[in-house]
From Swiss-Prot:
CDD domains: SAM_Scm (cd09578)
Domain SAM per the UniProt entry, residue ranges: 258-325
Lineage of the species this protein comes from: Eukaryota, Metazoa, Chordata, Craniata, Vertebrata
Purpose of the protein: Putative Polycomb group (PcG) protein. PcG proteins act by forming multiprotein complexes, which are required to maintain the transcriptionally repressive state of homeotic genes throughout development. May be involved in spermatogenesis during sexual maturation.
Localization, UniProt: Nucleus
Keyword Nucleotide-binding assigned: no
This protein's name: Sex comb on midleg-like protein 1
Listed GO MF terms: chromatin binding; histone binding
Region called Disordered, residue ranges: 138-157
Keywords, comma-separated and alphabetical: Nucleus, Phosphoprotein, Repressor, Transcription, Transcription regulation
Modified residues (Phosphoserine): 138, 238
InterPro entries: SAM, SAM/pointed_sf, SAM_Scm-like
Domain of life: Eukaryota
Entry-linked Pfam families: SAM_1
């Protein structure tokens, strides 16, 4: 008999003959077709091929994943090496900054300029120490044109340093009310008797004395226009302005007895161009004759802030004062 699940298409039915004539039963033999028998192994082989291909693809994917994992591990190692090198560089830089740390009190932008200024000052001091004062040094004074015969054009007498040796050092040249005697030989070719006349306005009060009162606006308060007209027009204009009206006897005393205003007048008459800027400085520091003789280049450069050229000139004039030599402008 054929099972219900079998199909007539897939089997071959054959009749089996019977030897019993009385029996009406018919027997059939069923056999499967050969085509159906061959189909089942083919299906199994196809499935096995598919599984092999899947295994190969899985193996390939796993191999690629392993390669990617190895590459990531190498990258991690390289990044660790780079990090160690960077940290080493940072530690070295921090150590160098700590060893070369600036002193407390110095700013980063002001430490080097201060050091440079110190070196420049040291060089200036060395230059001044090696500087020699030649005897032939003679400062030049600018000569201004004579415009008119106004009282400001009055000539001043030559400044002679030999006169202070004959003077008495006990007498104060500025506080003395009486004028010192006039030496006509010191005046070139003009008569200055009226210029040094003992007027009450000149020596009687402090407002009339030009040296004692530096705020005097002009010398019109002391001299009249008659004195100005008596001056010869051939005389050049004096470089000293309104503060030059002081008696010669007062300025030719010993330098140690000079007052502050006498020192100021000495600066103006000696070299107005170079030394006049020091007038206010000397007045503020109250530099008198004794202090003037004690001044050195180091004091002028460090404490007074004077330039090197001006300090050299002033020290030269102070040395001439100490030697008692005479130089006329």
């Amino acid at each position: 008999m054929m099972s219900d699940s079998s199909s007539e298409i897939d089997v071959v039915k054959t009749r089996i003959p019977t030897y019993d004539e009385d029996d009406n039963t018919i027997l059939y033999a069923y056999e499967t077709k050969p085509e159906f028998v061959n189909k089942e192994p083919n299906i199994v082989s196809d499935a096995s091929c598919n599984t092999e291909e899947q295994l190969r693809t899985v193996n390939d994917v796993l191999l690629h994943c392993q390669v990617i994992y190895d590459a990531l591990q190498n990258l991690d190692k390289k990044t660790d090496v780079i990090r160690r090198k960077v940290s080493k560089i940072q530690r070295f830089y921090a150590r160098s900054l700590w060893t070369n740390r600036k002193r407390s009190g110095y700013k980063k932008h002001s430490y080097r300029p201060v050091k440079k200024l110190k070196l420049q000052k040291m060089k200036k001091n060395e230059v001044y120490e090696t500087f020699s004062y030649p005897q032939s040094y003679s400062p030049t004074l600018p000569v201004s044109r004579r415009e008119n015969n106004s009282p400001s054009n009055l000539p001043r007498p030559p400044f002679c340093m030999e006169e202070y040796q004959r003077a008495e050092p006990e007498e104060d040249p500025i506080l003395s009310r009486t004028p010192s005697p006039v030496h006509p030989s010191d005046f070139c070719e003009h008569n200055y008797q009226s210029y040094y006349a003992s007027d009450g306005a000149m020596y009687g009060s402090s407002s009339g004395l030009c040296l004692g009162n530096p705020r005097a606006d002009s010398i019109h308060n002391t001299y009249s226009t008659d004195h100005a007209s008596a001056v010869s027009p051939s005389v050049t204009r004096s470089p000293v302005g309104n503060d030059g009206c002081i008696a010669e006897g007062n300025i030719t005393k010993h330098p140690s007895t000079w007052s502050v205003e006498a020192v100021v007048l000495f600066l103006k008459q000696t070299d107005p161009v170079a030394l006049c800027p020091l007038v206010d400085l000397f007045r503020s520091h109250e530099v008198d004759g004794k202090a003037l003789l004690l001044l050195t280049s180091d004091v002028l450069l460090k404490h007074f802030g004077v330039k090197l050229g001006t300090a050299v000139k002033l020290c030269y004039y102070i040395d001439r004062l100490k030697q008692g030599k005479c130089f006329e402008n």
